[in-house]
Amino acid sequence: MPKVGMPKIRRPQLVSATMTVIDRVGLHGASVSLISQEAGVSSGIINHYFGGKHGLLEETMRDILRQLSCDATKRLNLLPKQAHMQRINAILDANFVGFQSESKVIKTWLAFWSYSMHDEALKRLQRVNEKRLLSHLKRELKALMSKEQADIVAQGIAALIDGIWLRGALNPEGINANKARIIINDYLEKQLTFYSQQ
């Protein structure tokens, strides 16, 4: 977390610069010097407020996760509570459309995933993100099937989101949101049919 006193205008500037530099040279090449140059600030500001590159990566991921959460919430708020399939698709769109599908965000996500396996602070952020996604999905799925079934199907959808997202991230053409929606809805319809026959 950044120290108190960091001017609010600087945070978005530094977060954006971090993503831009990661997009351009990768995480290992994204030095404090390059990030500060991109942001138009001194390296000392990054070291003072964030304790270096690691702290800035953590703040950048917090920002990306906040934006993902806000986007999902906005999309859900536009839909009736009973429109469960539409609401599930809104959750998918929050993950595959707009800001989350920009090249600089995708590359920052990939860096975050690899680092979060070995870093407790980043691992906590990943767990928060995973719990939030599963919570959104289960809320909608429980209206369509039993709680136990909803738990299993939510895990399946989350795995598909991660897998499709990763494949899209590594594809030069990027993430195909329409194809992602088709694949996940096909899985969901098959699960609904299967569980309705139980």
Curated annotation (Swiss-Prot):
Annotated region of DNA binding: 31-50
The HTH tetR-type domain, residue ranges: 8-68
Protein function: Repressor involved in the biosynthesis of the osmoprotectant glycine betaine. It represses transcription of the choline transporter BetT and the genes of BetAB involved in the synthesis of glycine betaine.
Key words of the record: DNA-binding, Repressor, Transcription, Transcription regulation
Pathway: Amine and polyamine biosynthesis; betaine biosynthesis via choline pathway [regulation]
GO biological-process terms attached to the record: glycine betaine biosynthetic process from choline; negative regulation of DNA-templated transcription
GO MF annotation: an example: transcription cis-regulatory region binding
Entries under HAMAP family matching the protein: HTH_type_BetI
Gene3D superfamilies noted in UniProt: Tetracycline Repressor, domain 2 (1.10.357.10)
Superkingdom field: Bacteria
Keyword Transcription regulation: yes
Protein's recorded name: HTH-type transcriptional regulator BetI
TM region positions: none
Pfam families linked: TetR_C_6 (PF13977), TetR_N (PF00440)
